């Protein structure tokens, strides 16, 4: 608009100069003179110029014939007064070119609106230095020394170490000529050594960063926007789930800012009885506690795309209500302070879309889970620090115990469907890595809050359950090999995916490495490599594998509180030794399992979506079936070595030995008695056992409150037509009731008249054994029972007392 007005003004002025029109009327002459003066100042809007000129002239000599010189003097005075009102004492210092540009852009404020002019001036450059407004300025540029990206630095050190070790092996093998089999063997070595080197590098970075005095600045306690605490579940133990949620709700209610949260339980359970158990536990949980932090329960009618689809459906329906969401797993437990701090940090960093909290393992009872706990407690913080520094703002997402910015998630994280059929095509199983990569691709930051504590998860207690979980994760991680080459992903996101897939491919690669190495050694007329080279390579390999454990041990020993929390220096050292020996013992078993998993996936096997068992009740036959293949492989290996390569029997004993003993080893690893025996002597002790957090104790105490009694189960079975039909279908056909007709009639009438709580265990058993009685009771109960209590708890359960504070 200003440009059009300026063009019209120029055309009018040019026309006047060409025609040399004489101006005879004094009033017209004065108005024209004032208009030209205002136009010269910079007002390009001719209509505005004429209006102001007429106003000034008429106000100069009202009722008399104005003179041009008086009108100009009045105009100059008006301009000076206006500029002084806007700029104060510095009005005379205004750059004229700046003033012309300002008046051309904002003619509406001139000589009329002082406050509006002041506001416009504030965003229109520097009036005294003559600088143009920011949108018309060149931006200051700086030339900094180029720095290599962190992902490149992170791969450089492992790459150099791996290249050196591989070159040494190839050089030793090539003394008598390098065969194709030897070249393949060297490539397999490079893969395994490189993967171990990345772990060593990450641990080393985390180890040295632990001595840094730099601390994350404290956040300011401000009012938080509305946020959701979301827990997706599928056929989980409802007592466990809702006890943890009540404990977290209590913790949030005591934390400043915690009242900004609302809790959601997102169920995908399909078993009607499981769903009824969840609803019973929810009714009890929702009826107690702090009403300012509401708890909601939702069960999907159709559970598409598993956990990722469960969360996606929630965010699409209700995500607009929340700025942030903290996502939990069914075994998650987080302090209220940790939950609030995650959101506060995201509030202070508007480019962060996802903030992952470190995970602490707890509640392990078996030897297997306690050994994993110890490894995570000693080396976990160091690895987390190293990964946080290496990945920087392109960190990874573990799938739970993390805060997300809902708008960024909705904007970037609609998971695509991979071309082709499962297992490597179709829906993406491991959504966490992919969501982090999509956020980074869109320019958002994904970070790890490595300094936080108070965020726990549980491990599968037995070896078969651990392998079953790895089966699901492996298929998802192998899909990542396709996603990692997608266009636009950040380099660090590709590294996360490739390393994650390599961790599962390491099993079959290691087995192939052992087989080819044994064949080469058995068929060679001389030793495959000299003893000196073999010793150097073995030492380098041991360093990469044991280095992280040693660094973690040193770091924990140097930290007084951490050392004492692990039982003291002696017990800590013994625990690390026991854990290292245990890990080396079960490594061949996991190698065979991962090999079978990868081969099954490559042959088209598709994982089934089953519930995660979190109890250490592994049956003997389950372990026998799981470890039978490993046992057979171990027996075949030692037999073939004895027949064709006897000198290698002792060398490869650490591999075939555990395989031969796979079944008893898996039994011991999955047993609670072995874990408790070591715990009795203080071995494998972790801080969560020596000083259990109040939140963990509270969640354990609350389980008794969320546990359903038999009368509640019986009530739901009678009232719910789906549960009733499922129960009747399981009864043997034409089976006689458990009691006499008279006993059955008395139980039916008592149930109809007094309700489920009045029945004894024998009466409930009698009624549930007779299909016709259950159908009759279903009709009568809806007529006579107070069914309002079916939807809301009739009795308000009393919370157990909170643990006394120290």
Language model regions located:
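Cytosolic/matrix-facing juxtamembrane and C-terminal tails of multi-pass cellular membrane proteins
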Residues: 331, 667-734
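Basic/Trp-rich segment in TM-proximal cytosolic loops or flexible interdomain/linker regions
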Residues: 126-158, 174-183, 212, 216, ...
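Conserved RNAP core-binding helix
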Residues: 45-63
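Internal catalytic domains of large membrane-associated glycosyltransferases
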Residues: 201-488
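A short, charge-rich alpha-helical start-of-domain segment used by transcription regulators
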Residues: 6-36
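Σ70-family region 2.3-2.4 aromatic/basic alpha-helix that recognizes the −10 promoter
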Residues: 67-97
């Amino acid at each position: 608009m200003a440009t059009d007005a300026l063009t019209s003004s120029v055309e009018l002025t040019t026309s006047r100069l060409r025609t040399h029109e004489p101006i005879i009327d004094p009033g017209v002459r004065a108005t024209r003179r004032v208009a030209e003066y205002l136009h010269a100042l910079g007002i390009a809007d001719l209509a505005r110029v004429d209006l102001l000129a007429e106003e000034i002239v008429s106000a100069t000599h009202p009722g008399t014939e104005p003179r041009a010189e008086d009108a100009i003097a009045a105009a100059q005075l008006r301009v000076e007064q206006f500029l002084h009102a806007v700029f104060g004492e510095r009005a005379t210092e205004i750059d004229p070119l700046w003033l012309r540009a300002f008046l051309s852009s904002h003619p509406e404020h001139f000589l009329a609106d002082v406050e509006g002019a002041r506001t416009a001036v504030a965003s229109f450059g520097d009036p005294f230095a003559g600088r143009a407004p920011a949108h018309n300025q060149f931006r200051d540029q700086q030339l900094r020394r180029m720095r290599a990206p962190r992902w490149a630095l992170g791969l450089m050190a492992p790459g150099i170490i791996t290249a050196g070790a591989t070159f040494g092996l190839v050089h030793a093998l090539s003394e008598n000529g390098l065969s194709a089999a030897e070249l393949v063997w060297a490539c397999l070595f490079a893969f395994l050594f490189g993967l171990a080197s990345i772990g060593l590098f990450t641990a080393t970075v985390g180890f040295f960063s632990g001595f840094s005095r730099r601390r994350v600045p404290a956040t300011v306690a401000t009012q938080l926007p509305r946020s959701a605490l979301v827990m997706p579940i599928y056929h989980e133990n409802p007592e466990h789930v809702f006890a943890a949620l009540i404990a977290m709700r209590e913790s949030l209610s005591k934390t400043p800012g915690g009242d900004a949260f609302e809790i959601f339980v997102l169920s995908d359970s399909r078993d009607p009885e499981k769903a009824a158990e969840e609803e019973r536990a929810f009714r009890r949980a929702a009826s107690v506690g702090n009403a300012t932090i509401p708890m909601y329960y939702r069960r999907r009618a159709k559970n598409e795309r598993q956990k990722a689809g469960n969360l996606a459906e929630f965010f699409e329906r209700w995500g607009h209500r929340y700025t942030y969401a903290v996502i939990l797993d069914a075994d998650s437990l987080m302090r209220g302070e940790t939950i609030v701090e995650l959101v506060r940090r995201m509030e202070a960093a508007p480019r962060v879309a996802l903030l992952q909290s470190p995970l602490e393992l707890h509640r392990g009872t078996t030897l297997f889970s306690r050994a994993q706990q110890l490894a995570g407690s000693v080396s976990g913080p160091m690895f987390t620090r190293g990964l946080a520094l290496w990945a920087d703002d392109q960190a990874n997402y573990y799938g739970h115990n993390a805060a997300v910015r809902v708008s960024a998630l909705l904007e970037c994280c609609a998971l695509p469907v991979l071309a082709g059929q499962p297992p490597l095509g179709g829906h993406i199983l491991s959504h966490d890595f992919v969501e982090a990569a999509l956020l980074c691709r869109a320019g958002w930051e994904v970070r790890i809050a490595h300094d936080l504590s108070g965020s726990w998860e549980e491990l599968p207690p037995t070896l078969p359950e651990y392998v079953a979980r790895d089966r699901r994760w492996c298929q998802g991680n192998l899909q990542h090999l396709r996603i990692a080459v997608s266009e636009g992903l950040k380099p660090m996101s590709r590294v996360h995916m490739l390393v994650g897939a390599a961790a599962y491919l390491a099993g079959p690669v290691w087995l192939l490495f052992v087989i080819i190495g044994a064949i080469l050694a058995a068929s060679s007329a001389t030793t495959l490599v000299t003893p000196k080279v073999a010793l150097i390579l073995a030492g380098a390999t041991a360093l990469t594998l044991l280095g992280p454990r040693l660094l973690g041990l040193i770091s924990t020993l140097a930290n007084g509180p951490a050392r004492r929390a692990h039982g003291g220096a002696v017990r800590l050292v013994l625990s690390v030794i026991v854990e290292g020996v245990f890990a080396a013992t079960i490594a061949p078993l996991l190698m065979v399992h991962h090999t079978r998993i990868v081969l099954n996936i490559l042959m088209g096997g598709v994982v089934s979506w089953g519930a995660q068992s979190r109890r250490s009740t592994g049956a003997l036959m389950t372990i026998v079936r799981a470890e039978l293949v490993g046992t057979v492989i171990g027996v075949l290996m030692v037999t073939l070595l004895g027949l064709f390569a006897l000198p290698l029997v002792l060398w490869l004993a650490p591999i075939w030995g555990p395989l031969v003993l796979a079944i008893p080893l898996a039994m011991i690893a999955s047993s609670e008695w072995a874990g408790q025996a070591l715990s009795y002597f203080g071995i494998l002790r972790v801080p969560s056992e020596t000083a259990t957090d109040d939140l963990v104790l509270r969640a354990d105490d609350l389980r008794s409150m969320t546990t359903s009694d038999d009368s509640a189960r019986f009530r739901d079975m009678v009232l719910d037509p789906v549960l009733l039909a499922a129960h009747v279908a399981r009864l043997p056909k034409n089976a006689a009731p458990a009691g006499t007709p008279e006993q059955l009639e008395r139980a039916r009438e008592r149930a109809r008249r007094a309700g489920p709580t009045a029945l004894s265990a024998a009466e409930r058993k009698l009624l549930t054994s007779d299909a016709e009685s259950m159908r009759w009771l279903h009709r009568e109960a809806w007529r006579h029972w107070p069914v309002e209590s079916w939807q809301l708890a009739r009795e308000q359960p009393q919370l157990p007392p909170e643990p006394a504070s120290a």
